[in-house]
Amino acid sequence: MTLQELRYLVALADHSHFGRAAQACHISQPTLSTQIRKLEEQLGVTLFERTNKSVHVTAAGREIVARARRILADTDAILDAGQRQSAPLAGHFRLGVIPTLGPYMLPWLVPALRREYPLLRLTVQEEVTSRLLESLTSHRLDAALVALPVSQAGLDSMALFDEPFWLAMPRGDKMAKGKAVTEEELHGQHLLLLTEGHCLRDQALAICGSLDAENAAEGDFRATSLETIRQMVATGMGRTLLPAMALGQPKDSAIVLRPLAGGLGRRIGLVWRHSYPGAGEIGLLAKLIASHLPRGVHRV
């Protein structure tokens, strides 16, 4: 049994499809199938239940896949520890980011990381918070950029910056005039929201403080991205809350933006496993982010 075979095993468990797993491993599908069958013969158990369209990890396979993840994570940690002795933030680093942050933060963060730490091999995973936390605890990620607070055993967090929300509405909307929007004005307002699972949706509903806002949004429109919602606002479908980094440049002339009174918004931070050996790397990443923050957000 080799480390490469364990990587094939984990890839197939993650993708639940021989073709996609083979592509991720940069090998042919027959080669992957042969390696998995060889591993099953060595272990004397069936690791995957195969169908015409997908594969599923068996009960026996789940424990073996979990152990394989830990072995691979420890192996990567050994390799990275050696590289860190000669250079900071070197080796493989797996970063997660929520979808309402990634499109607006990664375009400046990734180039900055490459300039400052050329030996870093960065892998980015964009997912909702619950899945990022699951990937952290299962050693598939090293750290994640999420909205705080996060309360989960075994995870540490560090606040980075506060990002205010803005009310976005079509030009001509009755709320389009004025300066900062108060909580009283927002209470019970109909907003266009993201689908369930996005933390920004929950934050918007908390600010509006009304089940009516949720019911109205569910009945009219649900989106999986802020950019889709922005376009719907521009066409006059309704209002939404946008984080500062998502306001867009140049500004859309069909959309009017008003800040929220009191700086209402979200706090963004890094989350990582308490047992993660590269705590110093987390600090370096946080420092780099703080030094490159765009206008409109406020360092904590």
Model-assigned labels for residue ranges:
Residues 183, 190-212, 278-287, 293-300:
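Secondary-structure junction motif
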